C-alpha cells in the first residue's frame, strides 16, 4: 500500500518510521520538501518526499499529521480527494495546550471531513504520543488505538493498518465518535 503523510514533524516522522519499518512505501508531503529531505532519506529507500499535492496524488491512504490549525486548509487545498482515505491524526488543542478548542457538538475530524471534498475521513493516531507511534511495544501489552469514521470499509482498512503497527486497533464507530477521542 502506498501511504502519504502530510507533515514531517514529530507525529509524521514517527508514523513514517514505523510504516517504513513494516515495509510500507511512504511519501511525505510538505510545502518545502528540501527542508526535510535529509531526515526522510534516513528512513530508507521506501520513504520519499515531495510537495503536498504530489504526495496526496501518490497515496492510496493519506495521513494528515499537521498542526490542527492547518488541517482544514490542507484538506481544502485538494479539489477532489477521489474517495481516498484521509486519516486525521490531529487534535484541536487550545492555546497553551489548555484543553480542546472544540466542544462536544463537533470534532476536528468532522471539520476536516467537511473541508475534504470526496475524502473518506477516518480519525486515528491521535490518542498517543509520537514516541509510541515510532515504537508501540510495551511489555504490558498493546496500546489501545480507536479508529472512527463514517465509511465502514475505510475504518476497517485503517484498523488493520493500526494493528499492523503493533497497536490494538478498535473500530470505534462513526466519525462523530471523534468528539470524545
List where the protein language model places each region.
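NAD(P)+-binding Rossmann beta1-loop-alpha1 motif at the extreme N-terminus of oxidoreductases
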Residues: 1-42
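Rossmann-like NAD(P)-binding element
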Residues: 44-96
Amino acid at each position: 500500500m502506498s501511504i502519504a503523510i502530510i507533515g514531517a514533524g514529530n507525529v509524521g516522522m514517527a508514523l513514517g518510521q514505523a510504516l517504513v519499518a513494516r515495509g510500507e512505501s511512504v511519501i511525505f508531503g510538505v510545502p518545502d520538501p528540501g527542508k526535510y529531505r535529509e531526515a526522510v532519506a534516513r528512513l530508507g529507500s521506501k520513504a520519499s518526499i515531495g510537495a503536498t499535492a504530489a504526495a496526496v496524488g501518490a497515496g492510496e491512504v493519506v495521513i494528515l499529521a499537521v498542526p490542527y490549525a492547518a488541517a482544514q486548509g490542507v484538506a481544502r487545498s485538494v479539489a477532489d480527494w477521489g474517495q481516498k482515505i484521509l486519516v486525521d491524526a490531529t487534535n484541536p488543542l487550545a492555546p497553551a495546550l489548555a484543553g480542546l478548542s472544540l466542544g462536544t457538538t463537533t470534532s476536528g475530524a468532522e471539520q476536516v471531513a467537511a473541508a475534504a471534498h470526496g475524502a473518506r475521513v477516518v480519525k486515528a493516531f491521535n490518542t498517543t504520543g509520537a514516541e509510541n507511534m515510532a515504537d508501540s511495544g510495551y511489555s504490558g501489552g498493546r496500546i489501545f488505538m480507536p479508529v472512527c469514521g463514517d465509511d465502514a470499509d475505510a475504518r476497517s482498512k485503517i484498523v488493520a493498518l493500526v494493528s499492523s503497527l503493533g497497536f490494538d486497533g478498535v473500530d470505534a464507530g462513526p466519525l462523530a465518535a471523534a468528539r470524545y477521542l
